[in-house]
C-alpha cells in the first residue's frame, strides 16, 4: 500500500544544472497542470471556475461578474461565504473587501453596475464607525465561521485599517471625484497613511496587504493628475515594512500560517521583488514540489469547529490557492 501511495504523491524534481554548473529553476509540468485543472473542475465553486476560465482558458470577464453577483445582497454588499471563512449571509465590510479584490483581479470596467452597487453600499455607512469599516460584525456569531471572524468589542483595535484601506482604494479607483463617498475616501486615506507613518511597530500581514492596495490606488490617481498626498515616504516605509513582515524561514511556509513572499509579490515588477528575489525563487520551487496527493495545495489553517462546514470551506480555499499559485508560476515562467 505504501508503494502505491508513493506513486500518487507529486514527486519533487531534482534540481538541474546548466552547462555552467548553475542551478536551474524547477518547473510545473504539463501533466501536473492538467491534474490541477481536473481537480478544479471537480471541486471548485462556480465563481472560481469562472475565474479559472478567465485566467487560463480565455474566459469571459462577464462570467466572473455573473458568478460574483450570486453573493451580493440587495443593499449592494456581499455575504453568503464569499470570504470562505465566514458563512454569514448578511452584508459585511470583509465580504465587500473580497468582492473588491476579485473585481480588481479581472480589471472590471468602471461602468459595470456591480461597481456602482458596491459604492452605494459603502456610502450607506453600514458597519462604518466614523473612522473605519468594521472587519467583524455581530451577526457573524450566528453562522458557521472561523474563530477570527467572531465578533468582539475590540474589533477596531484588533484589525486597524483592514479592510478599510482596501475599500477606500476601491472607492478612489472607481468612484467619481465630485461624490461624497470619494471625498470621504480621500479623508480616510490621509488618516490611514498618517497612522501608518506614525507607527513604530509592525502591522499584520493582512493590514499590510490592504495598505498595498491603497498605495496602488494612489499611484493610479497620481497618473490621472489627482494628487492629494505625497506617497513617496509612505511607499518607502511600506517597502521596509513588507520586508520585515515576510517570514524568512522557508521551512515554515507550508506548515505555519505566515506571510510568504508571494503574499505580497505577484510579479517581477513588484516594488517588493528585488529585496526578496532569492526568497521568491525558493517559494516558486516549493510551490512546485509541495503539492498534495491530489496535485493541489493544502491550506495552513483550521477553524477548530464547525467541522462539516470547514471541510467545504477548505476546498473553496484550495481552489483560490490554485488560481493564485498558477498565476504566479505562469508570471515567472515556471509552467512548461
What does each of the following model-derived ranges do?
Residues 1-2:
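Methionine residue identity
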Residues 9-12:
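Acidic, Ala/Val/Gly-enriched low-complexity intrinsically disordered segments
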Residues 15-25:
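Short, Lys/Arg-enriched N-terminal segments with co-localized hydrophobic residues
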Residues 23-336:
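Preference for long, amphipathic alpha-helical scaffolds in soluble/luminal domains
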Amino acid at each position: 500500500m505504501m508503494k502505491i501511495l508513493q506513486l500518487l504523491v507529486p514527486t519533487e524534481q531534482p534540481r538541474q544544472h546548466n552547462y555552467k554548473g548553475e542551478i536551474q529553476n524547477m518547473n510545473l509540468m504539463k501533466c501536473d497542470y492538467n491534474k490541477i485543472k481536473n481537480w478544479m473542475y471537480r471541486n471548485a465553486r462556480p465563481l472560481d471556475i469562472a475565474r479559472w476560465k478567465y485566467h487560463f482558458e480565455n474566459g469571459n470577464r462577464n462570467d466572473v461578474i455573473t458568478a460574483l453577483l450570486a453573493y451580493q445582497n440587495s443593499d449592494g454588499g456581499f455575504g453568503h461565504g464569499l470570504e470562505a471563512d465566514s458563512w454569514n449571509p448578511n452584508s459585511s465590510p470583509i465580504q465587500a473587501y473580497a468582492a473588491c479584490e476579485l473585481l480588481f483581479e479581472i480589471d472590471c470596467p468602471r461602468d459595470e453596475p456591480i461597481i456602482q452597487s458596491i459604492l452605494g453600499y459603502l456610502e450607506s455607512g453600514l458597519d462604518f464607525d466614523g473612522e473605519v469599516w468594521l472587519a467583524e460584525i455581530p451577526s457573524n456569531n450566528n453562522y458557521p465561521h472561523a474563530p477570527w471572524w467572531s465578533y468582539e468589542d475590540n474589533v477596531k483595535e484588533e484589525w486597524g485599517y483592514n479592510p478599510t484601506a482596501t475599500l477606500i482604494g476601491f472607492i478612489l479607483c472607481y468612484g467619481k471625484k465630485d461624490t461624497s463617498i470619494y471625498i470621504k475616501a480621500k479623508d480616510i486615506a490621509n488618516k490611514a497613511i498618517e497612522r501608518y507613518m506614525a507607527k513604530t511597530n509592525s502591522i499584520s500581514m493582512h493590514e499590510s496587504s490592504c495598505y498595498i492596495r491603497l498605495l496602488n490606488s494612489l499611484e493610479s490617481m497620481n497618473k490621472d493628475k489627482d494628487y492629494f498626498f505625497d506617497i513617496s515616504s509612505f511607499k518607502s516605509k511600506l517597502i521596509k515594512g513588507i520586508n520585515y513582515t515576510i517570514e524568512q524561514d522557508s521551512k515554515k511556509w507550508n506548515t505555519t500560517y505566515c506571510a510568504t513572499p508571494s503574499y505580497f509579490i505577484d510579479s517581477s515588477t513588484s516594488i517588493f521583488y528585488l529585496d526578496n528575489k532569492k526568497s521568491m525563487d525558493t517559494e516558486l520551487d516549493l510551490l512546485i514540489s509541495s503539492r498534495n496527493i491530489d496535485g493541489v495545495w493544502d491550506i495552513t489553517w483550521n477553524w477548530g469547529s464547525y467541522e462539516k462546514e470547514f471541510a467545504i470551506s477548505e476546498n473553496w480555499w484550495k481552489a483560490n490557492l490554485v488560481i493564485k499559485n498558477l498565476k504566479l508560476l505562469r508570471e515567472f515562467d515556471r509552467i512548461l
